[in-house]
């Protein structure tokens, strides 16, 4: 019984480590696509640029607001292996809850976004 408990604990810790290593700060793991425009104690503002077909490694963001600078199509793959395609029009702004993903520009034009990451806890009303 102890051996089974030990094995399950070790497997759980290994899985958690893999997930944490895969979901990292996008600026650190993909500086080609993510640039910091502004940062203070409350927010970090990122400029995101993907050429057609570009893909990023798995990373995570806190709660954020995305402002789309052009019409675009993207595919997001999540840590559980599921994926979804999304589209946005130039000038749209969307709330994006905290989470990890692996984005890919599946459109035929560059993908340009300004992402405002919130550093504090978001109060639910």
List where the protein language model places each region.
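Bacterial N-terminal signal peptides that target proteins for export
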Residues: 1-11
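Short acidic-glycine-tyrosine-enriched beta hairpin
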Residues: 39-42, 80-98
């Amino acid at each position: 019984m102890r051996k089974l408990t030990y094995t399950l604990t070790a497997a759980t810790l290994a899985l958690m480590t893999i997930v944490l290593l895969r979901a990292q700060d996008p600026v650190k793991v993909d500086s080609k696509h993510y640039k910091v425009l502004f940062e203070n104690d409350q927010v970090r503002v990122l400029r995101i640029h993907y050429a057609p077909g570009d893909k990023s490694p798995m990373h995570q963001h806190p709660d954020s607001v995305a402002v789309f600078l052009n019409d675009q199509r993207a595919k997001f793959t999540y840590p559980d292996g599921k994926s979804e395609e999304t589209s946005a029009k130039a000038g749209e702004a969307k709330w994006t809850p905290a989470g990890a993903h692996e984005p890919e520009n599946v459109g035929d034009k560059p993908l340009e976004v300004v992402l405002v990451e919130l550093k504090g806890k978001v109060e639910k009303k």
